[in-house]
Swiss-Prot record:
Residues 1-2 are lumenal. Component of the UFM1 ribosome E3 ligase (UREL) complex, a multiprotein complex that catalyzes ufmylation of endoplasmic reticulum-docked proteins. The UREL complex plays a key role in ribosome recycling by mediating mono-ufmylation of the RPL26/uL24 subunit of the 60S ribosome following ribosome dissociation: ufmylation weakens the junction between post-termination 60S subunits and SEC61 translocons, promoting release and recycling of the large ribosomal subunit from the endoplasmic reticulum membrane. Residues 78-90 have a biased composition (Acidic residues). The chain crosses the membrane at residues 3-23. The gene is ddrgk1. Residues 112-173 have a biased composition (Basic and acidic residues). Residues 28-173 are annotated as: Disordered. Belongs to the DDRGK1 family. It comes from Danio rerio (Zebrafish). It is a single-pass membrane protein. GO terms for biological process: cartilage development; negative regulation of IRE1-mediated unfolded protein response; positive regulation of reticulophagy; protein K69-linked ufmylation; protein localization to endoplasmic reticulum; protein ufmylation; regulation of protein stability; rescue of stalled ribosome. This is DDRGK domain-containing protein 1. Residues 24-300 are cytoplasmic. One of its GO terms (cellular component) is endoplasmic reticulum.
């Protein structure tokens, strides 16, 4: 399509050049003819006669000559004017044809250029949109990775802390158990008697069984049962809780409540299922989940 346009433009340009040369030749011929006519008129014009006082007839002949010359000049001009008018008309037509042809070619190219620019702008907009979506996705991925890394570090930290606490508790329980086993003392009438290892172990088991069967025991009664001071009984309970021999709590009324591991698991499962619970709800659930009825009522 572009080759056809180029050939058409070259043909139009060639016609314009030939037309311009033709007009120029006609103009030069007309100039030569005008020059010859003027020269002929000048040479044919009579010379002015010397003024005379009574020379009226001679002046009238000169006047007639000038009038005739002017008439001949006008006739010559009228003969030349149709040719010049035709040439001017042809020049105007050629000039009008050139902008029209050039305008058609230019409008088509302009339309193609605008369509090309529109497609390019659309592609750029789509590319920018894809890049924006990709950037947002990368940001979301980075945020998710940060959250996952933060959670992983927190879990690792909690596991390390639990492991440290567990190891520390096991070490302390072992130390307390050895100390309790080796130095279990019964105070009788203000005198301390050190027991053998077998007796100490037997008395320790009796102490544990008494608490487990009683379920709820006053600390003063527990101390009196084994001939201990109340503070010593509390210390023994704390040591046994620390090494895992007993599980339970000491309330603010001076009682120890024994809770089995199964009951503790039941309470933990209740809290896990309910999520957030109040103290009153937990106390109400504990009455059904924890058995507080003693197995025996005896004193040593």
């Amino acid at each position: 399509m572009d080759v056809v346009l180029y050939i058409a433009a070259a043909a139009i340009l060639l016609v314009l050049i030939v037309f311009s040369v033709k007009i120029r030749g006609r103009t030069q011929d007309a100039d030569v003819e005008d020059h010859q006519n003027v020269t002929a008129r000048v040479s044919a014009r009579p010379q002015a006669a010397p003024e005379r006082a009574a020379g009226m007839p001679r002046r009238r002949r000169g006047l007639h000559s000038r009038v005739n010359a002017q008439r001949a000049q006008r006739a010559s001009d009228n003969e030349d004017s149709p040719v010049e008018a035709d040439e001017d008309e042809e020049g105007r037509n050629a000039s009008e044809e050139r902008p029209q042809a050039a305008g058609k070619v230019g409008a088509k190219k302009q339309r193609k250029l605008e369509e090309k620019q529109a497609r390019k702008a659309q592609r750029e907009a789509e590319q920018e949109e894809r890049e924006e979506r990709k950037r947002l996705q990368e940001l979301r991925d980075q945020e998710r990775q940060k959250e996952e890394e933060k959670e992983r570090q927190q879990e690792q930290k909690q596991e390390e802390e639990l492991q440290r606490v567990k190891e520390e508790q096991e070490r302390r329980e072992e130390e307390e158990y050895q100390r309790l086993k080796e130095s279990f003392i019964i105070e009788d009438q203000g005198e301390a008697e050190e027991l053998t290892e077998h007796e100490s172990q037997s008395l320790l088991q009796e102490f544990i069984q008494y608490v487990q069967k009683s379920k709820v025991v006053l600390l003063e009664d527990l101390a009196s049962q084994f001939g201990l001071r109340t503070q010593d009984a509390i210390a023994r309970l704390q040591d046994l809780i620390a090494d895992g021999s007993l599980t339970g709590v000491i309330d603010d009324r001076g009682k120890f409540i024994f809770i089995t591991p199964e009951e503790l698991n039941a309470v933990a499962q209740f809290i896990k299922q309910r999520g957030r619970v109040s103290i009153s709800e937990l106390a109400q659930a504990s009455n059904t989940l924890i058995n507080l009825t003693p197995d025996i009522h005896s004193s040593a």
